């Protein structure tokens, strides 16, 4: 029996190492460009560790059982009549409960942090219309722009508006996503941490041009942002 | 007492019950597909006339409105005509009109030749096979559509189809797979197996059962017919979000109405299962002696009956907005856009369990009998189904974390969503514990059950990611979702359907499938499934949204790999089809109980007698007493002679 447990654990470790390699050798997430996405990635890794453990456990038992207890198809004996084990059943009810509640708490904390606006965030209105995005910067007069420009390090609060059908504002490197819904005002916060060029993607099927409903997003320094605003205001 | 064989009374009908007409008369005016065809046409004409007369009476302009004519004429009146024509209502109409009915007439019961499968048949075993063959036909059609748009997606940019056709293919693929394959395929397996497992001669309402089946092809044809509608097939996704769906071309109506027919089919079948399971259990078959497949279908039927009216409502509201100019979901008229999503997901989340719980039942049967061990923790397995049922109704808004719904609703919905992992985890761990120290027979159904076990864990774990609101905000509406639902619905549901079809194939057909081809089918499917869907997690997280015909060229290589793998996945079905068809025709004759399983369906011949049991079985113990010396699930002798042994 002890030999069996060692073998089972060995299989579990091998599977766990393989799955961990898959998880870390590929870069599954885009490089974060916002504080919000940094926090989301922490939750992602929490869930990943949990998943690796659970998958390895189940896969190891399946592989071990088939390897150890497979019999020829014409074998006609029965296995031992084990109907259950209350202790085990309590354990595999309680442990997952603790794990998912822990994940729930971590998620709720991150959600609340990602939703808490600072005193004066940069106000940006994102307007979705088949099949283009428009951005308005209410703090700087009434100009609008087809490209999204944000200053690095400053929190921006997006207010979404949809002209016709539902669209969804998404920049993969920002990690944040929110639908723009006709008749409903929705908001989302983004605090860019690095400069660069990104794509605003519409993530909600909105019609024939949905796949091409994209806009350019640029995160620039505060000085460049001020310069850009001046040009736009002129 | 010995139950008399109901069929034996067949010959005793008085002569005046014999059909008085010539065979030509019967062909056109007797129940059947010919009468179904002309009565469908007549229904269409009548419905169209009704619309035109009413519209001109009220002097509405224009008198001819194609959408209204199609809804009333083609999608309500014609199907009703078809159902009347094939004879689905004959018995009830005879009864209502006071004409003689023949409650003991079993001429429409059971199959004596292949033609009996093409008419209204009240035998649950025939209906089960009707369901399975029909649903597999739609599985092939839906699969071909998937391969078609995977060909389009093999490279960025548009190559083969235009944008509306692409959206149509994606939408109809999902709709067929959900409403015409997974849900009814499970209904088909359960139709065949559940009455047998209960020790019942048939379902509680055999005529309703026949009607439930014939509603299904109507829905399927409606979804497919949307491709010939002006403007193309419905292209708002299977979710058909308003207000986008309300501005779609005519094809959208085919979705709105098709869902009604498929939904009616599900609801009627579910009611039938509930009444059958509650009232038709053999003596001694207490709830705690029912096989887990029966438990699973009991739970699923509760879900169907409670939830399905919500999708019917959501689609009627969209239809009303489209043709009656109401404003349920149009903000200009005071409608609430998110209302659609709340009502839709109040069905469509439980629908995920409707598409999974019957599979849980199948896997419990297969793993237990192929490991030669009792199901580990039988009662907790049944209770966890109930736990999923209850929790399943409290999680719908997790599909709406980025939809702009009330912020305060997100954390409670996240908690309930994550809690579902507990009963699901119990089931997964109990199956693995059932394997422990078993004597494992690695047959094809067992391979699919084990494939399910591992793939479903991946789908469940990606569900944990999506249950967490912050991760969902990043991953929602991307290919990560596509990967997740295919791990749940293909690696989960479809694998269990294959397991079930292989497992009960000898019982259904009386012949054995080819084990070698079955194994080829499994491994081809298993490998190509993973190569197809696993990389989708990656492209989704990296920034590829779902439902797009064009995408960032950075994802080109991976999408090419995915497309090639999807073709292999499609081709693997050929192995299954060849195996099933040739084995059905000339496979080796199967024994009554090739798996030496204990549940009741294996205690009768393969295929079972026309009324299942020549004598009513007396159930004396649990269904999974493998390895218990002298244990029996049932004794097939008259009830009063049976001795009770503790379960």
Task: Show the residue positions of the predicted features.
Chain A
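N-terminal membrane topogenic signal
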Residues: 1-10
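Non-transmembrane, membrane-proximal soluble domains of secreted or membrane proteins
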Residues: 2-3, 21-45, 59-61, 66-234
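Hydrophobic core of alpha-helical transmembrane segments in multi-pass integral membrane proteins
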Residues: 9-24
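Globin-like tetrapyrrole-binding proteins
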Residues: 51
């Amino acid at each position: 029996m002890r030999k069996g447990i060692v073998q089972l654990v060995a299989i579990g470790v091998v599977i766990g190492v393989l799955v961990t390699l898959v998880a870390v050798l590929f870069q599954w997430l885009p490089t974060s460009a916002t504080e919000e996405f940094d926090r989301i990635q922490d939750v992602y890794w929490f869930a990943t560790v949990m998943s690796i453990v659970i998958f390895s456990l189940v896969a190891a038992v399946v592989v071990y059982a088939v390897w150890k207890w497979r019999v020829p198809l014409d074998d006609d004996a029965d296995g031992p009549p084990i109907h259950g084990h209350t202790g085990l059943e309590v354990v595999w009810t309680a442990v997952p409960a603790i794990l998912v509640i822990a994940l729930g708490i971590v998620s709720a904390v991150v959600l609340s942090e990602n939703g808490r606006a600072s005193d004066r965030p940069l106000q940006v209105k994102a307007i979705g219309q088949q099949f283009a995005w428009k951005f308005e910067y209410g703090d700087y007069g009434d100009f609008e722009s087809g490209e999204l420009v944000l200053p690095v390090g400053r929190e921006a609060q997006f207010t979404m508006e949809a002209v016709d059908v539902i669209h969804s504002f998404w920049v993969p490197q920002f990690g944040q996503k929110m639908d723009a819904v006709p008749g409903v005002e929705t908001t989302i916060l983004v605090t860019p941490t690095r400069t660069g060029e990104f794509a605003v993607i519409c993530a909600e099927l909105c019609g024939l041009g949905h796949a091409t409903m994209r806009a350019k997003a640029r995160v620039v320094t505060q000085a460049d942002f001020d310069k850009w605003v001046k040009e736009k205001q002129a | 007492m010995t139950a008399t064989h109901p069929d034996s009374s067949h010959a005793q009908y008085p002569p005046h019950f014999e059909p008085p007409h010539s065979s030509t008369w019967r062909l056109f005016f007797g129940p059947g597909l010919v009468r179904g065809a002309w009565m469908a046409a007549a229904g269409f004409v009548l419905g169209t006339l009704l619309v035109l007369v009413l519209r001109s009476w009220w002097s509405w302009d224009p008198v001819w409105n194609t959408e209204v004519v199609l809804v009333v004429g083609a999608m309500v009146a014609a199907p009703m005509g078809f159902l009347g024509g094939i004879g689905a209502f004959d018995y009830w109409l005879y009864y209502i009109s006071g004409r003689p009915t023949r409650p003991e007439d079993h001429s429409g019961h059971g199959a004596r030749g292949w033609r009996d499968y093409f008419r209204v048949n009240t035998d649950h075993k025939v209906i089960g096979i009707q369901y399975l063959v029909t649903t597999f036909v739609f599985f092939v059609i839906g699969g071909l559509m998937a391969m078609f748009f995977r060909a389009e997606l093999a490279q960025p940019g548009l190559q083969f189809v235009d944008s509306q056709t692409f959206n149509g293919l994606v939408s109809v693929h999902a709709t067929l797979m959900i409403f015409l394959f997974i849900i009814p395929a499970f209904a088909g397996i359960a139709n065949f197996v559940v009455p047998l497992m209960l020790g019942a001669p048939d379902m509680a309402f055999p005529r309703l059962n026949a009607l439930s089946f014939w509603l299904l092809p109507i829905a399927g044809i409606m979804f497919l017919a949307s491709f010939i509608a002006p403007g193309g097939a419905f292209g708002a996704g299977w979710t058909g979000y308003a207000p986008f769906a309300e501005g779609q071309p005519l094809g959208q109506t085919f979705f709105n109405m098709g869902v009604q027919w498929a939904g009616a089919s599900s609801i009627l079948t579910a009611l039938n299962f509930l009444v059958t399971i509650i009232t038709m259990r053999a003596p001694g078959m207490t709830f705690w002696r029912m096989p887990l497949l029966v438990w699973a279908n009991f739970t699923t039927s509760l879900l169907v009956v409670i939830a399905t009216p919500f999708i019917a409502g959501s689609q009627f509201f969209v239809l009303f907005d489209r043709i009656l100019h109401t404003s349920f979901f149009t903000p200009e008229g005071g409608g609430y856009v998110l209302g659609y999503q709340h009502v839709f997901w109040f069905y469509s989340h439980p629908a995920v369990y409707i598409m999974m719980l019957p599979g849980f039942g199948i896997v419990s049967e297969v793993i237990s009998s192929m490991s030669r061990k009792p199901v580990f923790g039988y009662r907790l397995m049944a209770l966890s189904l109930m736990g999923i049922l209850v929790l399943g109704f409290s999680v719908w808004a997790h599909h709406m974390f980025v939809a702009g719904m009330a912020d305060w609703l997100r954390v409670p919905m996240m908690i309930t969503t994550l809690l579902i992992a507990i009963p699901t985890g119990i089931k997964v761990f109990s199956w693995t514990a059932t394997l422990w120290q078993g004597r494992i027979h690695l047959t094809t159904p067992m391979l699919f059950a084990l494939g399910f076990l591992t793939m479903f864990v991946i789908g469940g774990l990606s569900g944990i990611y999506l249950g967490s609101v912050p991760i969902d905000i990043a991953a929602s509406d991307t290919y990560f979702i596509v990967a997740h639902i295919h791990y749940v619905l293909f690696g989960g549901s479809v694998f269990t359907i294959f397991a079930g079809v292989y497992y009960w194939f000898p019982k259904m057909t009386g012949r054995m499938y080819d084990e070698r081809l079955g194994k080829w089918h499994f491994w081809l499917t298993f490998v190509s499934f993973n190569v197809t869907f696993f990389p989708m997690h990656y492209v989704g997280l990296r920034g590829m949204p779902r439902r797009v015909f064009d995408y960032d060229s950075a994802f080109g290589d991976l999408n090419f790999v995915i497309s090639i793998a999807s073709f292999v996945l499609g081709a693997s079905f050929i192995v299954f089809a060849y195996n099933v068809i040739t084995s059905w025709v000339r496979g080796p004759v199967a024994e009554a109980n090739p798996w030496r399983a204990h549940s009741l369906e294996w205690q009768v011949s393969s295929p079972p007698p026309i009324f299942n049991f020549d004598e009513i079985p007396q159930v004396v113990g649990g269904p999974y007493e493998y390895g218990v010396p002298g244990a029996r699930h049932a004794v097939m002798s008259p009830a009063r002679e049976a001795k009770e042994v503790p379960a």
